[in-house]
Amino acid sequence: DFSVYVPTFHTMEKRDYLDVMILDFNKMVEELGSIETLKTDFVSNVSHEMKTPLSIIKNYAELLQRDALSEEQRREYGEAIENTATRLSDLISNILKLNKLENQKIQPEAEVYDVCRQLCDCILQYESAWEKKEIEMEVEMEDRAEIYADQDLMELVWNNLLSNAVKFTELGGVITVRQLSDEQGVTISVSDTGCGMSKNTMKHIFDKFYQGDTSHSKEGNGLGMAMVKRVLELMDGEIQVLSEEKQGSTFIVTLPMAGKEFGQL
């Protein structure tokens, strides 16, 4: 029971060594209670996130067993099952990745590389997605900018930011990717003209499983931005978000220049 509280024997002015030990004990119990609450919330969130796609798969599987279904219906139900199974697989994969990141089981393998080239490669991966929504993709960056980071982990960052931008930008909108360098480091921003975020959503956007309002809950599991935050912490980088409801969002990433090695875990 983490609600146990042991009172001290003396007032603040007359506290002795035993009182200090009691205060330390109470603080430890409070911290353990917080950890237990986080664990409980995590299990609850995972259960909820897995239950929803499993229910969808079950419902469509039952529909497929009906007689006299047209070929179009069978194809539609099959695609729905496949898409939902992919979401479930992504959820499990993200949970495992985030767990490894938070428990330091993934050690960054940093090297000096051209982040501009990496950004261009990541952007091109979403070409069919933005063209399908008739989104205008604007890119402003230098010919080359070197950073010292783990390429694979940084690719995870860019893919999350770009996929979110495409996902939340409406038909005919605009996505802008900017990069610039100065003496402090490299700054990359990803802006969109999508639905934007409320102040409360902005406050919690990097929390695990947080999806904000209904406009930010579609096709997601609330883990991507938590991973982005953790990866950038490992790289001694930072991320901030600027957004207004119905006015779009901008995510700004800052990274140290090549030659400035990040701190060891």
Question: Which residue stretches match the model-derived regions?
Answer:
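Detector for a conserved hydrophobic position within an alpha-helical segment of the HATPase_c
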Residues: 232-233
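Short helix-loop "hinge" at the ATP-lid/N-box region of the Bergerat-fold HATPase_c
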Residues: 165-166
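Membrane-proximal coiled-coil signaling linkers
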Residues: 15, 32-70, 76-77
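HAMP signal relay modules and closely related sensory coiled-coil linkers
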Residues: 4-27
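Conserved catalytic submotifs in the C-terminal HATPase_c
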Residues: 9, 109-114, 131, 136-146
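Short conserved segment of the HATPase_c
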Residues: 197-209, 229
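Short alpha-helical segment of the dimerization/phosphotransfer core of two-component systems
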Residues: 83-88
